[in-house]
Amino acid sequence: MFLLEVGNLKENFAKYFSVEAAVTEELKHEVFRVRHAVYCEELGYENTNPDQEESDSYDARSLHIALRAQAHGRIVGCVRLVQCDPDAPEKLLPFEKLCTDAIDRSIIDPAQVNRHAMVEISRLAVLSDYRKRKGDSGSPMAISEEDMGTRDQPRFPYIPVGLYL
């Protein structure tokens, strides 16, 4: 990829998408519906729910971010920042709870980090129409060398980068 040739990342991203904090209940429900479409219906990582929303106990202490498509104004992606519980900082973040044996404490030891300054980024979800191209396999994410483009036609993965920024 020829990043310097891509141009201004923010301007290019803003042509197609806007990112907003999901602070209203209505917007949070839209985020939970996107997560359900991706994690439950498409990928089968979680069980489907009659309300067609995917949520868990960490959502109450999370900041939810929504990705809105400029073309039609609908929410097409999301991500969340799980914060440590201010009333019970000893409560673990999802990664700490689910992957405790995988954490290399010689690199970082969560027990030594200020709990109030720590968050976990999780539940990144993008509707398949915005994540996949025609001809992609049934895999959740298909990336190839061509995705980065060429010198004559550079490309950049705006959606995941935009959600993480």
Regions found by a protein language model. Give the residues of each.
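Amphipathic alpha-helical interaction segments
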Residues: 72-74, 88
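Acyl-donor binding region in acyl/amide transferases
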Residues: 86-165
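Short amphipathic alpha-helix that is part of the acyltransferase structural core
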Residues: 4-52, 57-60, 64-68, 75, ...
